[in-house]
Amino acid sequence: MNAFAAPPMVSLDDARQALETTSKVVIDIREPYEHANGVAKGAKLIPMSQLGKRLAELPKPGAEPFLVICNTQNRSANIVGQLQSMGYTNASYVNGGMSQWARQAWPMVKP
C-alpha cells in the first residue's frame, strides 16, 4: 500500500449486507463503554485498546476479507491503515460507523 493511499472503505449498506448474508467477519473496535447502546448483530467485539494483544483473533493477513467498524469511522480508518501496513490487505473500514448504523435504526443487540 502506498504510504499516502487511503485505507480501503466499504459502505454502511455493504457492511449490513455482509453481516446478514455472508460469513464475512466484522470487527467492532469500540471500547466496552460504547457498547451500551448496542452492537451490530454478528459483529466480533475487539476493543481498540486490546487489538494489539488480540491480532490472532483476526482473519490471517491476506486471507478472507474482513471489516472494521467504530463509532464514526475515524478510529476504524486509522486501524485499517495500520493493519494494511502489517500485511492485512484484506481489511476495510466501514464508512459512517455505528453512529450512522443507529441513525438508520438498523437492528442492534446488547453484548
Language model segments and positions:
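Rhodanese-like catalytic fold shared by cysteine-dependent sulfurtransferases
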Residues: M1-K24, P32-P65, N74-P111
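Short, surface-exposed ligand- or partner-binding patches at beta-edge/loop junctions that are enriched
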Residues: I69
